Structure formats: structure tokens, C-alpha cells
Regions:
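Exposed extracellular interaction/assembly regions and N-terminal maturation sites
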Residues: 1-84, 111-112, 132-133
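Short, aromatic/His-centered strand-loop micro-motif at the edge of beta-sheets
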Residues: 89-95
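Short, Lys/Arg-rich amphipathic alpha-helical interaction segments
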Residues: 107-122
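Register-specific beta-strand positions within repetitive beta-rich fiber domains
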Residues: 125-133
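Tight coil/turn sites that cap or link beta-strands
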Residues: 96-100
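Cytosolic nucleotide-binding catalytic cores of signal-transduction proteins
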Residues: 103
Length: 133
């Protein structure tokens, strides 16, 4: 039987969170924060998303349910782009095939919040021999 009691004082401790989730996106989905939502559609710190069969949207959870700085990475491992919207339906990002995006909350004053996003490792680069000399 699983217990959530500390061996160092018998206080109740929560189960550990998960850090990775594979998402098969076959319809629009609204995510929730794991501490506020039951079910499978929760945010994980790292999510690999495969969008198939259409143009789908991921709606982010309410920003005002967590602290500023809450973050996660979304990697599109499929061949189809998908959209990301805030909790009020506003456009946040389009994640193209092969892209990885880092999302974090900079304001949680509303459910929509203010999200900052940057792209990891998209594109190519090469050394310029004249710059190296």
C-alpha cells in the first residue's frame, strides 16, 4: 500500500510530481495545473506534443492559479503545427513541427495572464572561417 507519510516525523507529504508527458493532440484541449485539476489533461514541465489530423489548439491553464515564473517546455515532435492560446482564448504562439518552446508566466493578475515565450534550437548555424581567424 502506498503511503504519503514522512519517515522523519510522520507528517503527511504529497506524492512527487511528474516531469514529462507525451501528448497525442487529436482535438483541441484545455490544460490544467496538476495541483488544481484531476484527469489527464495537465501541464507537465516537459511535454512532447504530436498533432495529427487537423489544426489543433492547446489552451493554457489559468495563470492566476499559480505563481509568476511557473514554466514548462513544449516540443512539437509531430509533422503538423498547432496553436497555443491563453486561458481567455488569446493567441500566445504557433508551434511549428520540430520546434521547442519555453513558456513562463510574467503576470498572473488575470486568468489569461501574461506569458513570455522563447524558441529553443530552431534553425541552423555554421562557423564563419573569417570570424574565427
Amino acid at each position: 500500500m502506498t503511503t504519503y507519510t514522512s519517515v522523519f516525523g510522520n507528517e503527511t507529504i504529497p506524492p512527487s510530481g511528474f516531469a514529462y508527458r507525451a501528448v497525442a493532440l487529436t482535438a483541441d484541449v484545455t490544460l490544467g495545473w496538476p495541483e488544481n485539476t484531476t484527469g489527464a489533461d495537465t501541464v507537465a514541465p516537459i511535454m512532447n506534443v504530436t498533432a495529427t489530423g487537423g489544426t489543433w489548439t492547446i489552451t493554457l491553464p489559468a495563470a492566476n492559479e499559480v505563481s509568476v515564473g511557473r514554466d514548462f517546455i513544449v516540443r512539437n515532435v509531430g509533422a503538423t503545427s498547432f496553436y497555443v492560446k491563453d486561458n481567455a482564448g488569446g493567441a500566445v504562439a504557433t508551434v511549428a513541427a520540430g520546434e521547442s518552446r519555453y513558456f513562463y508566466i510574467t503576470s498572473n493578475a488575470t486568468a489569461a495572464g501574461t506569458w513570455s515565450i522563447f524558441t529553443y534550437g530552431t534553425g541552423t548555424s555554421s562557423a564563419d572561417a573569417s570570424a574565427l581567424a
